[in-house]
Amino acid sequence: MATDRRVARVAELIKREISQMLMSGIKDDRVGSGMVSVTDVDLSGDLQHAKIFVSIYGTEAARAETMAGLKAATGYVRSELGHRVRLRRTPEVVFLEDRSLERGTQVLSLLNRLSEERQKNADLDEMAAEEPES
C-alpha cells in the first residue's frame, strides 16, 4: 500500500500525462468532437485502479460520442501510460464524465434567480410601506 502522499503525486502525474495524450496522442476523431479536459484522477491506494474524471464541453451528442471514443481508447491510454510513467504495474484506467462544473453553474444560476426575486419582493414591500393610507 502506497502512502497518501505518493498516491497523490502519482495521480497528479497520471493526470498530466493523460491531458497531454488528449491533446496530441489519441487519434480517434470522436475524442476531438467535444473539448475535453481531465478534472481529477482518483487512484486506489495500491496504485492498481485509476478513475479518470473528464469534463466535456459541447452538446449532449458530442459528450456521448467523446465518452465512446475515450472508452475505445482505454487500451491505448493504459499502454502509453505504462511507457510514460515508471510503475511496477500500470493501473487499470476507467474514464468517467465529471459534471460537477455543470451542476455548479446550475446552482449559481438558481442562487442568482432567488436573489433577484428577493430584491423584487423587498422593493415591492418598500413601495407598499411608502404609500400613504387614505
UniProtKB/Swiss-Prot annotation:
Gene3D superfamilies: 3.30.300.20. It holds the Pfam family RBFA. Its main location: cytoplasm. One of its GO terms (molecular function) is ribosomal small subunit binding. InterPro entries: KH_dom-like_a/b (IPR015946), RbfA (IPR000238), RbfA_dom_sf (IPR023799), Ribosome-bd_factorA_CS (IPR020053). PROSITE patterns: RBFA (PS01319). GO terms for biological process: maturation of SSU-rRNA. Keywords: Cytoplasm, Ribosome biogenesis. It is found in: Cytoplasm. GO terms for cellular component: cytosol. One of several proteins that assist in the late maturation steps of the functional core of the 30S ribosomal subunit. Associates with free 30S ribosomal subunits (but not with 30S subunits that are part of 70S ribosomes or polysomes). Required for efficient processing of 16S rRNA. May interact with the 5'-terminal helix region of 16S rRNA. Belongs to the RbfA family. Monomer. Binds 30S ribosomal subunits, but not 50S ribosomal subunits or 70S ribosomes. This is Ribosome-binding factor A. The lineage of its organism: Bacteria, Bacillati, Cyanobacteriota, Cyanophyceae, Gomontiellales. The gene is rbfA.
